[in-house]
Amino acid sequence: MKNKIFKVSSYAVFAAMLAISFAGCSSSSSSTPVASIPPTVQVKDTSGAVIAGATVYAIPSADVTAIATQPISLDGATGLYTAAAKKVDEPLEDLINGNYTPTGSGVATYQSGVTGVDGKVALASLPTNSTTYFLYVKPAASDTGHLPGGSLCRTAVTGASLANMVTAVKISTVQSASATYIGSSACIGCHASYATEKKTLHKLGIMVPKSPSALQDVSKFQGATDDENFYAGLNKFETGATVYYYTTGVTTTTGSFKTLSTPPTGTVTVYFTLVLSKVGGVYKAQFNNIKTPTDPNSGMVYDVALTYGGGLHKQRYMTKIGNSIYVIPLQYNPQGSDSSPDAGRTVWVEYNTVSLGWWDTANNVFTLPTTKKYKSFDVFCAGCHYTGYSVAENASGEFVSTAVADANGELHPVAGTKMEMNIGCESCHGPGSEHSAAGGNGKFIVTPKNLSPEREVMLCAACHTRGDSMGTAGTHGSVEALLDTNLKQMKPGTSRADFLANNTSASRNDAKIGDGLWADGKHSQKHHQQATDFIQTKKYRNGTALKTCASCHDVHAPGSDKHQLSGSSDNSLCISCHTTVVVVAHMTAKTGTSMGSSTKCIECHATKTAKSGSGSPTPGMTGASGTNYYQGDISSHRLDVTLKSSISSTNAMPIPYTSGCGSCHSTSGL
């Protein structure tokens, strides 16, 4: 009986399956196949609002590859970018704006469309194959609340990956012109996970001596050696130190003094000394004129109101005179050595004694920097350090600067109130008043990762380049910080084209030979030029993945080695992208010898051509010509290999020709 039931049941199931199967093949079926859709993009902003009226472009990777072949030429003699360079230095926006048109292609040929009220646009004619594109969003001309770029404009995607689906793209919002600064304390109140920024050197640059504010944490910089100790320079004030300013000639007309912390010997002329001390809890510098003892200013004492730098390469000291802040003509180099054959690599070095107005070379007497008020820290430097920077010239010709008020900030020595006198959240995200009033949630705030890559790089480049500013200190010419004619910093989200036009002068955009560049006109010699280097790399312009500073650096934390690297500098950070490179095999192929597994990518591709403090105080090697080859302390961000073949009689560097190089490369020809 059971067998009969089983057979009947099995037959019934089989019959039902056949019926369903045949029904699916019937021409009278009521079922509808899933309809295919063309590649569709939906644009929203960081608050989740859909964006209508924006144009979405599919930029062929081949065009970005093509623009990358065009040089970003910088005239080494003038520091001016050529007209042609300014048409190819923004890899996506120069294509979209028609500044560069690859042969047989260009913006007129791109698949594009305008988003509707639902934020969607169909790129109906986009080939859905292996061809790759960067998806770029340009808000409507009337849309002042959003910035161009988008979350899919950094890495190329295939047309096939966009087929038969709606692809989400997110763009950044931006503040209105009336937004105001509120200080990082307000930001961290909601975004507590980013409090790690307190440990970065961006936050530690300006400090009341040994009195970090509640927005500063020096714990990363309290090592046992001087070059790891943020307070190493101030410690020398406490034990007492005398710095001798001298020349090896009879006189000086340039103020280019040599310095030692012990009396110099030999045929020298000592002009003056700075006696460093700490008295009554105050750090002091006494100026004593040795050359002209009758100088009425000899013996003057200035208190150190603020330190400037520290923790890595150097530290300077600032004092208050009247209503302005001035830099004392002294720099501490924690890696320096008084036995160095290079006068710029000693423990203490003079800092612009004459140009800042501290010394009269004609009469060999002290002057006061108030004779050059236009070179005060307030107008010359603070623009790249203060959050919410503002400066004005008063009736006495003094330049008085302020930062955004913040109860946890640094004590301003002139105003007597606490301000955020260092780089903070709003330096890169823009003023936060509207964002805060709207309850956050991505409204009225610049989100760097959703900008075009060139605009994100500009957030750093605004200070990490070396040009002349469009803004001037009254009638006295341009200043060090690249300010506009209103003496304001570039607003986050600004394009490179607008920055060059509005913040750099018509006579100089960037570094030049003798002031920032080595004689090859390419490699950086001075600090804060990392962006000058980086825009020349394949990382910045290529047809695969457009990198920014934040691709390697963690902007919110000190990183693994104090340089805010996102990973270790032992090769793992490089190999996280260059996954197919076997380092030892690569080195062998390039150099013809096995370099060993301990060799680092950065030893060849990020050589320390530039100097901020002392760099290496002793030469790594001396060439056959007798030229000393030193190593700096700032890595070249061109990421190329500085070749020995680039050396000439007029260009002894930039190769930081250390013993590391010399272990395989001879000094012949140097």
Go through each PLM region and give its residues.
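Extracellular beta-sheet/turn segments enriched in Thr/Pro/Gly and aliphatic residues
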Residues: 32-33, 152-178
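Surface-exposed recognition patches
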Residues: 321-419, 425-430
